[in-house]
């Protein structure tokens, strides 16, 4: 997994500040074109832009757009949103699937052979206002999922006005983590606008349901050898009844105490919750506190999984009841739900349960899928296809799939937007 040094954010600000220095704030897209990007030994052959999408709501969302290296005029337009909520989508650009990636020296960029803009025009949007370089006129950054969906929709409409040459291109909405909320809520608005050629949505390691994520995490932890038989027996005794377990909002005090032990093991024992089998950047501290190990010392992602930890900000069943409803609107679109299978922040089992809860007809039974690796064809993971939704795992990957498994991720992405069998 790519390692980014602790001065990543400082360098990122340097890149953006330097890049924006070359821009005019008066015109777009020509005024937003990046003519020189520090850190690259050779400037790209494709066009790329950075600027603001100014919304009538008083929000100004920063974007970075990279044209396709293939056929920009006909290749799809892909919108990418990182999660959090509160993580910059420049994480996706500069550490996951963008055309240039931050290198270990923290001072240079190098081209990514598995960049998603090899075959698509990709729009990275910093959302909501307050994230990254995005801001609000009234300085009020309190928001909710409904408002964020509206502003993301308005941002996409504004982008298509500034770049009318892409107005008829196929559009795919994609995201990661809390993108499991952002993307379906945005898609519901976009699908009501016939002027946007929406073709599909994809979510990686998404937060689709707090309840299912919490319940599945305990099973994940036990079957990956984290809990031990004594703790597991206690959980079965106090949190389960007739084979059904409630690790989400169980009011049994003995169950709650044991779930606290699970929380400590998963989040505070020195494990990397974003990739169970990856080391912690900077190493595990001698004295462990309630600070989560991160796969990147400066890439801070929000913890979703523990009701014990976050019960004061969660509303029971809200995710499952409302956002399952959002997915039901997408029946005529191609939908991909994919998960790195060693992520503990948004584990694969919870998302698989979520997809199955939609009760769609199974079209293709669970099977392996393959990609071309350095040593020939390799197993990328497993895939199960329903009426219009595919659930796909990426073997050995954590939360940020394109970072951990770039070749497999590119193959998956290519098949998704090209409507090829996985």
Q: What are the roles of these predicted feature ranges?
A:
Residues 1-422:
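Terminal and linker regions of secretory-pathway proteins
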